[in-house]
């Protein structure tokens, strides 16, 4: 991820129209991930988790939840929220790490790895490098989920409509109308115009995952509210399988 994108996500930004939006966003993602946890004993990695306000929902469904976040201020908030000695949300099943710590973890550490709304901010080379790490970290028969993949024909208008539907169903519709106007003049729109977002055809992701040693397929639904975006599920192939 470029320093510009990392600084954006680690700062004060206009992506969420208000606190209600942010809460609903993270609760929906946590509920969706919790349903994917393969067993109550599974160790789960959420890579690029952001503020993960409702990580406790995922942790309740798993043996352990590891939150991996590159943005230092966001990571500090996560540690204070879930791992601090005095934090009201302290949860012994949640661990917060940086990407460099993840890369030092032993082989076969996880039964589920989730990468949601991340790879559009990475180059294809960066994503390929990550897949190699994930392939090593996953246990035999475990699962990798890549969510919020933007197809080449994905439009900002589709994202806006999905957000408006979410807002209407959850009581922040008027705030969203104002928030979308603010977003037009925000750093996000400027960065998106300058740096772009990495987009993938379905077949391109399938090929990339296959080359990294996974048996992949498109998931029936995306994690979260935006079903115009894609999600993929993959399991590491055993050494004897081609």
Named regions from a protein language model:
Residues 128-140:
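A short glycine-rich, Lys/Arg-flanked "PGG" loop and its adjoining helix->strand segment in the class I
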Residues 1-37, 41, 51-104, 145-242:
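Class I (Rossmann-like) S-adenosyl-L-methionine-dependent methyltransferase catalytic domain
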Residues 43, 64, 109-111:
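Structural signature of beta-strand start/N-cap positions in the alpha/beta core
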Residues 117-118:
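Short catalytic micro-motifs in class I SAM-dependent methyltransferases
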Residues 47:
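Conserved beta-strand/loop positions that form the S-adenosyl-L-methionine
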Residues 123-124:
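Helix-capping/helix-break motifs at membrane-protein junctions
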Residues 114:
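A conserved beta-strand element that flanks and buttresses the S-adenosyl-L-methionine
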